[in-house]
């Protein structure tokens, strides 16, 4: 694990040390305790998303200890969707939904999974592949929004009997309530092509980026990299934006961008300035993706998005 806490000593001491700093299961690091005699390695925090269970097993193998795994899905041999998400590199938009998915699988039920990306391998026990995201319990997609994949599943509604007149339905008819929001797993398949004026600050780039994400309906965590022309490779505002977002910056020379295929919005001014008629759209397309959001200009910054295909696998690494 690249972000983990390993304690050598009593688990209780480790718990007291960790407790004041626990924030969220999506951001907390793995926490593992191993006793001084190297007999037991115990995951204490972030067993699935943080990888503490896996770390405990790794430490146990190295020290000749016994890993003490207590998470219900692992104990019962049930698929852990959050472990799969971590291994597949997917971000969790609404972690509160993990419990609902796991609870259904633990009770012997089934869940439907919809993915915008191909997934190789046999689905785990209890998981069905859905062709309609509106009927999915798990949605794997770069697109954001509370309604993404939202559904009303007639077989699992939890309505109550209401009197006539309140819903316009006859007395005794159950009012159908919407199903819970699906677990949304964000796949990092978006390339953000970015152009900017010289000296553009990180805040201006972030503002334009978030505006574009909102208009495109894209989760910001779906962006895998930023791309631009090579003359912007040392633009401090752009570099600071990428550092804050923890994404790489790909740069391309003007002659390479000019050969990128696809429909773009040409600009004579941009051509005269940097040698190619468009930066953001061509940079977004340079990695071979499909343009899904054309140029947005805001505050001296231009942003465009392309989507690349990423093949996922049900096999955990």
Positions of PLM-derived features:
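Low-complexity intrinsically disordered segments
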Residues: 154-155, 164
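Conserved mixed alpha/beta catalytic, RNA-binding, or beta-rich assembly cores of soluble enzyme
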Residues: 4, 8-53, 58, 62, ...
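A polyampholytic, Gly/Pro-enriched intrinsically disordered region
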Residues: 51-60, 89-94, 267-281
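N-terminal glycine-/serine-/threonine-rich phosphate-binding loop
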Residues: 1
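C-terminal non-catalytic interaction/assembly regions of soluble proteins
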Residues: 210, 221-282, 288-291, 297-301, ...
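C-terminal edge-of-domain segments
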Residues: 136-145, 184-185, 281-317
């Amino acid at each position: 694990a690249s972000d983990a806490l390993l304690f050598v000593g009593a688990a209780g001491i480790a718990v007291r040390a960790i407790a004041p700093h626990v924030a969220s299961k999506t951001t907390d690091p793995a926490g593992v305790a191993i006793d001084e005699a190297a007999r037991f390695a115990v995951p204490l925090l972030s067993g699935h998303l943080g990888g503490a269970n896996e770390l405990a097993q790794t430490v146990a193998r190295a020290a000749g200890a016994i890993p003490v795994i207590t998470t219900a899905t692992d104990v019962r041999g049930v698929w852990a969707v959050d472990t799969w998400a971590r291994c597949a590199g997917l971000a969790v938009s609404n972690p509160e939904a993990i419990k609902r998915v796991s609870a259904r699988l633990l009770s012997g039920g089934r869940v439907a999974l919809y993915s915008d990306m191909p997934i190789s391998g046999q689905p785990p026990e209890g998981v069905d592949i859905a062709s309609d995201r509106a009927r999915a319990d798990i949605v794997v997609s770069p697109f954001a929004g509370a309604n993404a994949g939202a559904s009303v599943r007639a077989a699992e509604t939890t309505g109550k009997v209401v009197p006539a007149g309140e819903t316009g339905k006859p007395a005794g008819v159950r009012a159908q309530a919407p199903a819970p929001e699906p677990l949304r797993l964000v796949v990092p398949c978006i390339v953000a092509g970015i152009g900017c004026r010289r000296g553009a600050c990180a805040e201006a780039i972030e503002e334009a980026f978030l505006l574009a994400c909102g208009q495109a309906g894209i989760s910001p965590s779906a962006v895998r990299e930023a791309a631009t022309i090579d003359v912007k490779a040392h633009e401090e505002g752009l570099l600071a934006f990428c550092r804050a977002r923890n994404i790489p910056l790909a740069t391309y020379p003007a002659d390479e961008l000019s050969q990128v295929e696809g429909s773009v919005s040409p600009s004579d001014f941009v051509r005269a300035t940097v040698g190619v008629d468009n930066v953001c759209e061509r940079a977004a397309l340079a990695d071979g993706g499909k343009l899904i959001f054309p140029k947005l200009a805001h505050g001296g910054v231009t942003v465009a998005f392309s989507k690349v295909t990423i093949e996922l696998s049900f096999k955990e690494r």
